């Protein structure tokens, strides 16, 4: 089996394609079950965030994985990147460290990679190969973030959106802000907003208890998601990041809210993939809609500022990839050595037991020892002898050269006048 990673991200695919490729909620376990049912796949894990969908697998080939992704989201094959073996290892190390993120060094991605590993493990999709890779990934990401400043003063998509809101509304502390969702992105937005102060903070979520917890931490007011439309007109700024499969905020709802606000502008940040806010909302006058793709341009300055630290992290990753591949190769080479040792041990034990029985039956010791020596020689040398004969017939120079390296002819060696037959003496 070969290690593969196939995926698309904010650099290779637009948001409308990424949202079709995303796996949210219960779709993730079902997708893993479907993947594991493929005869070419032995292990699999899926990483799905607002900026990327990636499939990690131990598989015979990549074609079946591409076909599987195409079945899930038709039309994405032209946007996919594909890595195998060492380059797949490097890619995962870079992703978990934040080097492949829209916001360079952002810390949330490591938690998302851990979540992907945990879900795959919980649903029996991981074997020793991928499990070992993810465990090593967590160690490498931790070291890269500890030994460099790639994660210093982290800037997230949420904090970038809040900064844009502050730039757009000179008096954000006199504004009403509506947060939709209660996940990590919205938690970060709430944290940054409460640090900068807002006049009123509304938090709407499908599970009211989660909204209430977040509201109590940041001085906000919790709303059930069913009340969203009723309170939309109160919001000067909206941040939305849920796992909904369909938009929660429609063009019609925003039009109604703008009329109720007497055309007072609204600023909306859709931080979700799939999108929470209908794209056509951005066509409305007095409604200013930003998606995660729009925010990528806003974080480019941050990316340039962290490049030196990122270069240091890349060097750490290069070293760790080399070490990981060396470990895998050493492990792979141990398997035939273990089989050879097991063959020798079982042959010895079998023939020794036979010799002891012959001694017990009164057979002369010298005769038993000679037969034991002949039998051991013939039994142990029969497999390589047969393989070398086949190699000679098939002109397999690689195998014959390996035999020469394993059994070099010693200077002054004289071939015996006869050799024992290539069979076990009875």
Swiss-Prot record:
Stretches the record annotates as Disordered: 405-426
InterPro entries: 4pyrrol_synth_GluRdtase, 4pyrrol_synth_GluRdtase_dimer, 4pyrrol_synth_GluRdtase_N, GluRdtase_CS, GluRdtase_dimer_dom_sf, GluRdtase_N_sf, NAD(P)-bd_dom_sf, Shikm_DH/Glu-tRNA_Rdtase
Pathway: Porphyrin-containing compound metabolism; protoporphyrin-IX biosynthesis; 5-aminolevulinate from L-glutamyl-tRNA(Glu): step 1/2
Residue positions of the active site: 50 (nucleophile)
PROSITE patterns noted in UniProt: GLUTR
Annotated residues for binding of NADP(+): 181-186
Keywords of this entry: NADP, Oxidoreductase, Porphyrin biosynthesis
Gene Ontology terms describing biological process: protoporphyrinogen IX biosynthetic process from glutamate
Enzyme's top EC category: oxidoreductase
Reactions accelerated catalytically: (S)-4-amino-5-oxopentanoate + tRNA(Glu) + NADP(+) = L-glutamyl-tRNA(Glu) + NADPH + H(+)
Gene Ontology MF terms in the entry: glutamyl-tRNA reductase activity; NADP binding
Stored NCBIfam families: hemA (TIGR01035)
Domain notes: Possesses an unusual extended V-shaped dimeric structure with each monomer consisting of three distinct domains arranged along a curved 'spinal' alpha-helix. The N-terminal catalytic domain specifically recognizes the glutamate moiety of the substrate. The second domain is the NADPH-binding domain, and the third C-terminal domain is responsible for dimerization.
Known function: Catalyzes the NADPH-dependent reduction of glutamyl-tRNA(Glu) to glutamate 1-semialdehyde (GSA).
Record note on quaternary structure: Homodimer.
This protein's name: Glutamyl-tRNA reductase
Source organism of the structure: Xanthomonas axonopodis pv. citri (strain 306)
């Amino acid at each position: 089996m070969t290690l593969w990673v196939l995926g698309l991200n904010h650099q290779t695919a637009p948001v409308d394609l990424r949202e079709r490729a995303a796996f949210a909620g219960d779709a993730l376990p079902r997708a893993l079950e479907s993947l594991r049912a493929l005869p070419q796949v032995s292990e699999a894990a899926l990483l799905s965030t607002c900026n990327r969908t990636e499939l990690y697998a131990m598989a015979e080939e990549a074609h079946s994985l591409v076909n599987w992704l195409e079945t899930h989201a038709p039309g994405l094959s032209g946007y996919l990147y594909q890595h195998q073996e060492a380059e797949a290892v490097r890619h995962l190390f870079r992703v978990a460290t934040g080097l492949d993120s829209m916001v360079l060094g952002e810390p949330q991605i490591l938690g998302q990679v851990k979540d992907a590993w945990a879900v795959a493990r919980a649903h029996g999709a991981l074997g020793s190969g991928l499990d070992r890779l993810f465990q090593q990934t967590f160690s490498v990401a931790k070291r890269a973030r500890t030994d460099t400043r790639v994660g210093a003063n982290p800037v997230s998509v949420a904090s970038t959106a809040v900064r844009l809101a502050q730039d757009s509304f000179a008096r954000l502390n006199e504004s009403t802000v509506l947060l939709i969702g209660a996940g990590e992105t919205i938690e970060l937005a709430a944290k940054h907003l409460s640090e900068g102060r807002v006049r009123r903070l509304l938090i709407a979520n499908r599970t009211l208890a989660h909204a209430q917890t977040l509201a109590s931490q940041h001085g906000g007011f919790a709303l059930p998601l069913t009340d969203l439309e009723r309170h939309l007109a109160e919001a000067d700024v909206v941040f939305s990041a849920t796992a909904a499969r369909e938009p929660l905020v429609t063009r019609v709802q925003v039009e109604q809210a703008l009329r109720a606000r007497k055309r007072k502008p609204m600023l909306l940040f859709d931080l979700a993939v799939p999108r929470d806010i209908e794209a056509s909302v951005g066509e409305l006058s007095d409604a200013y809609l930003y998606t995660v793709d729009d925010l990528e341009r806003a974080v480019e300055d941050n990316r340039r500022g962290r490049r030196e630290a990122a270069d240091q992290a890349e060097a750490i990753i290069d070293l760790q990839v080399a070490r990981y591949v060396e470990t895998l190769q050493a492990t792979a080479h141990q398997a035939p050595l273990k089989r050879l040792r097991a063959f020798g041990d079982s042959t010895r034990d079998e023939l020794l037991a036979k010799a002891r029985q012959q001694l017990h039956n009164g057979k002369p010791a010298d005769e038993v020892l000679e037969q034991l020596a002949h039998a051991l020689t013939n039994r142990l040398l029969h497999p390589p002898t047969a393989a070398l004969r086949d190699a000679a017939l098939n002109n397999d120079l690689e195998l014959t050269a390996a035999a020469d390296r394993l059994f070099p002819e010693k200077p002054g060696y004289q071939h015996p006048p006869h050799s024992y037959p290539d069979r076990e003496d009875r």
